[in-house]
Amino acid sequence: MKNIFKLTALAVFLCCLVSCDDDEPIIPTLEVTPANLNGTWELSEWNGTPLAEGTYCYVVFNRKEQTFEMYQKFDSMYARYITGSFSIKNDPYLGAVISGEYDFGNGEWNNKYIVTDLMESGSMIWTAKDNENDVNKYIRCEKVPENIIAEGSYEKSVIYWK
């Protein structure tokens, strides 16, 4: 009788293990390193919404120097070309956190960002460390469009002449 009870308990336990299956597939992500960020990225969504027409942000990361070039048009009627350096730190609770500093003594980025879902297919999510509602989705692209480089270069030359 004891053996039947043990076998029944074992059979129930094994059935429970077999029935426990995660229906969602695990999508592999890349480790957040300067090498995996290297290249050109376009901001495609801000807080789940596509960018308004006429606004853009392209970031070009250089893994060797850990520098960035940014072409953006958000808070001004003119495009801006911004340069600086970045660093990635691994927080044991949050994961990879990216931060940056602008060149020419213009200070640090307003936020540090938790980088998640860095996909081999070419997308990643940045969430502001101090504001979980500030979420940015970047997609990898081949290069910054020439007209945007020209627009950013024009603004750069205007700034230096002022």
Regions found by a protein language model. Give the residues of each.
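C-terminal motif of bacterial Sec signal peptides marking the signal peptidase cleavage site
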Residues: 15-19
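Sec-dependent signal peptide recognition
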Residues: 3-10
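Short, solvent-exposed loop/hinge segments that bridge or flank secondary-structure elements
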Residues: 39-67, 101-109
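Edge beta-strand at a domain terminus
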Residues: 81-91, 128-162
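N-terminal glycine/threonine-rich, aromatic-flanked beta-hairpin/loop signature
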Residues: 51-97
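N-terminal helix-cap/turn-to-beta initiation motif at the start of protein domains
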Residues: 25-42
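An anionic, turn-rich surface loop/hairpin at beta-sheet edges
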Residues: 96-118
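Short, solvent-exposed coil/turn segments at beta-strand boundaries
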Residues: 37, 59-68, 89-95, 115-125, ...
